[in-house]
Swiss-Prot record:
Binds 1 zinc ion per subunit. Catalyzes the dehydration of methylthioribulose-1-phosphate (MTRu-1-P) into 2,3-diketo-5-methylthiopentyl-1-phosphate (DK-MTP-1-P). It is an enzyme of class 4 (lyase). The gene is mtnB. The keyword Zinc applies. It comes from Stenotrophomonas maltophilia (strain K279a). Zn(2+) binds at residues 104, 106. This is Methylthioribulose-1-phosphate dehydratase.
Length: 213
């Protein structure tokens, strides 16, 4: 009999694994996680997060494909390999106790928007009714600038850039140039709402840009 003990609630991990599997499958079916890309996580407790392992088809995840990391991004419990971008998840859990879920996707809309708006460093969104989808917003009469960070394989550098901007600006997500979108929320439902709102608003901006030449 396996008597291994873990420094987290394994029953809670099982619940979160199924939550992640079900939601990530839907995002994969939408075409937002091509070629094993993207990564997804959920806060497990005040020291750990459940996160998808690296290199797996996100439309075919099983419970063993969800691992645990601490907030320094290190594997806990099982010796599995987390995503190279794990630090971009755990920095949010460490900084904001209210954040419960982080989603990272690679839809064509998100990736194209990241390329087109990289020179400006942000995507400006203003006057849209769907801006009310972002937690804390109650009107369309507002504007937000969604940052576009330069892509890098050095997650320490990128996480520092994100932290520096979070010191100055309230964010619900950000883009990485030529890469994709990070969005988060208090739980899976809120994180998905933010993710889907960004997708819709970026699509609108790209269409306006195309129509106006």
């Amino acid at each position: 009999m396996d008597t291994t003990t873990f420094p987290y609630d394994t029953a809670r991990l099982g619940e979160l694994a199924q939550l992640l599997i079900d939601n990530v499958r839907e995002l994969a079916q939408a075409g937002w996680t091509p070629a094993t890309s993207s990564n997804f996580s959920h806060r497990l407790d005040d020291r750990h997060a459940a996160i998808t392992v690296s290199g797996k088809d996100k439309g075919r995840l099983i419970e063993d494909d969800i691992m645990v990391v601490d907030f320094d991004g290190k594997a806990v419990g099982r010796p599995l390999r987390p995503s190279a971008e794990t630090l971009l998840h755990t920095q949010l859990y460490r900084r904001f106790p209210e954040i419960g879920c982080v989603l990272h996707t690679h839809s064509p809309v998100q990736t194209i928007a990241s390329r087109l708006y990289a020179p400006q460093g942000h995507v400006h969104l203003e006057g849209y009714e769907l801006l009310k989808a972002f937690a804390g917003n109650s009107t369309h009469e507002m504007a937000i600038d969604v940052p576009v960070f330069a892509n890098t394989q050095d997650m320490n550098v990128l996480s520092k850039q994100v932290d520096d901007l979070l010191d100055r600006q309230n964010l619900w997500g950000y883009l990485i140039d030529g890469h994709g979108l990070y969005a988060w929320g208090r739980d899976m439902a809120e994180a998905r709402r933010h993710l889907e709102a960004f997708e819709f608003l970026f699509h609108c901006e790209l269409e306006l840009r195309r129509l106006h030449g």
